Amino acid sequence: MSTISYTAVGRRKEATAKVKLQPGTGIITVNKKPGETYFNYNSEYLSTLRGPLLALGLENDYDLHITAKGGGIKGQTDAVKLGLARAICTMSSEKRESLKPHGYLTRDYRAKERKKYGLRKARKAPQFSKR
């Protein structure tokens, strides 16, 4: 007998997170570590990734099994948030209407701008010398 699970992928900058949502007691596991340990007990990160569940009042009804790769912790947190919102939408399409106004289903497309030739960074030019 297999348990019901919902899976989705979220991305932000260079970070990618696969989120698996299963009925449970609210345990968060990131890369086989407890969520609090992985995010260094930072309450801001933990509340950000729990956002979609808190908006629907489901924070203690589902366990999260997350695989996060790339980027930094902040990017991974936002990737998890998007993946979680998408997983909730696959669970029930009625929940989409309550997640959409909060912005949980919107992917933040901003990424690092590429370096251009003749410049030191993406936009930083070498110092101009008149003579």
Swiss-Prot record:
Pfam families, sorted: Ribosomal_S9 (PF00380)
Primary subcellular site in the record, as a coarse category: plastid
CC per GO annotation: chloroplast; cytosolic small ribosomal subunit
Annotated localization: Plastid, Chloroplast
Recorded GO MF terms: RNA binding; structural constituent of ribosome
GO BP of this protein: translation
Membrane-spanning segments: none
Family statement drawn from the similarity comment of this UniProt entry: Belongs to the universal ribosomal protein uS9 family.
Protein name (Swiss-Prot/TrEMBL): Small ribosomal subunit protein uS9c
Swiss-Prot/TrEMBL keywords: Chloroplast, Plastid, Ribonucleoprotein, Ribosomal protein
Organism: Emiliania huxleyi
Source superkingdom: Eukaryota
Alphabetized InterPro entries for the sequence: Ribosomal_Su5_D2-typ_SF, Ribosomal_uS9, Ribosomal_uS9_bac/plastid, Ribosomal_uS9_CS, Ribsml_uS5_D2-typ_fold_subgr
UniProt cross-references to PANTHER family, sorted A to Z: RIBOSOMAL PROTEIN S9 (PTHR21569), SMALL RIBOSOMAL SUBUNIT PROTEIN US9M (PTHR21569:SF1)
